[in-house]
């Protein structure tokens, strides 16, 4: 047992949560104390201590409004903390997380889900670092100045690329600043480029195993081995199409921001989370238990019911039986690694 394992063995971490997208929508509609009133009870009930909250920019804000939308989300988080003092805290490193947890609060960290807010201005990456952002996803599932993202399903397109020259600069500057790179949503070429140009551990915050669910959003066995060899961690994503194999046809909610997704073949008569254990065991068989955690990607709380069907867990309270079963399926130290200490090892690297 390492020092991190021992110090944080009861900590539960979700490395990818689209909380601020919902906070933005609800505050724009006039709601206040959004996190406290709509989200925190479920998070606490599930025993989740640390949330990495993404700064995601919908297409409608691009290209001109990407920076402003990201800053709006950060500003609204600070408004939420003022309105709900003592319930949750914005953290930037392991020391702040430990203090927050010891005070009985939920710890929130920030991640860029795509570098659209900085455009092609590298100085803005430093600005986001100073604002407390500590994780950098180079791209969502689209092209930007840094890289090509992968698609959820096959589309007609021209030749895809990996990292651009600017993307290489982002990789180098992020690591210089002490930020952690996130390869979820990158295409295979961009993943290989990150492996080539980065020097430090990187993560895949919300990606599963492609050998089990064959989508470009998941990692191949070779990618998992490369990520593990670098000391990284991957987070289990709760989207059904990334947990299970898919069948013919597509499903999505009307007027959704999500792309059309293939229908997931979910086994009947078993919990919807059953498929997660295939991914966990596959990763452990490949690289051991030190490189898998949670990255649930819960973005369904205020979405239509038809869109919630795309998720294993509509809300955090639905994760409770799964998190509890982790402790029964795996030895104590392995269960602790999956629940949170693997992610804490990464967070300990933050400055």
Where are the model-predicted features located?
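Structural preference for beta-strand elements that scaffold enzyme active sites
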Residues: 10-14, 50, 107-111, 134-135, ...
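Histidine/acidic residue-rich metal-binding segments in metalloenzymes
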Residues: 120-130, 134, 152-203, 216-231, ...
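Aromatic-lined glycan-binding groove of carbohydrate-active enzymes
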Residues: 220-259
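Mid-to-C-terminal alpha-helical segments outside catalytic/metal-binding sites
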Residues: 2-6, 314-351
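Conserved, mostly hydrophobic/aromatic
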Residues: 16, 43, 93, 132, ...
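Short acidic/histidine-rich active-site segments
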Residues: 237-238, 287-312
